[in-house]
């Protein structure tokens, strides 16, 4: 188990390092494809989530979904009937499709989406909902015929998905001067706490290490998240790597 954890940790840091040098969406596509295959996935997609009156076309960022499936999904406007997308709007934790939908009663249209996805070997998957503090919603999904992920694998995929999404949003913005001006002011103590979070420590553990109260550490973490416009710790770590706050 320790060797597995070490291997996954090395994979994550290699991915973060190589992604930092990515010059285009194609570079990210290649790297993300390798990560997907490592964890047993055949397909992946990164997309924003449109409002109820919008279509997905302009929100889709990157992916290798089967052309046949994506065309059908887009033409039938399945995004608003997709139970995975619906679930991602209401939670901020990653989930395996089969586990999350196990006790769900799907309506006819939602069941149709999942049944038709199976025709393209999208039988199960793993999705990472991503929300910004400003309310923008996105989702990163991995698809396969079968999903087998350890807790360590899930955490790693969450972090890499959040990082890739953040990186792609920055590339789409493509305004270096604005990004430099918008770089948040992070204190030495905040940077230290981000490092501990990236090392897998909980707020309680960090409080013990630094000799501070649990509430104090929680408040610092929440303040960092506000500065980075993210809503949870994995996104905070990913954005900190992208902005070179930590390396």
Swiss-Prot record:
It holds the Pfam family Autoind_bind. InterPro entries: Sig_transdc_resp-reg_C-effctor, TF_LuxR_autoind-bd_dom, TF_LuxR_autoind-bd_dom_sf, Tscrpt_reg_LuxR_C, WH-like_DNA-bd_sf. The keyword Protein biosynthesis does not apply. Residues 203-222 bind DNA. One of its GO terms (molecular function) is DNA binding. SMART domains: HTH_LUXR. The keyword Transcription applies. Keywords: Activator, DNA-binding, Plasmid, Transcription, Transcription regulation. GO terms for biological process: regulation of DNA-templated transcription. Residues 179-244 form the HTH luxR-type domain. Positive regulator of the rhiABC operon. This is Regulatory protein RhiR. It comes from Rhizobium leguminosarum bv. viciae.
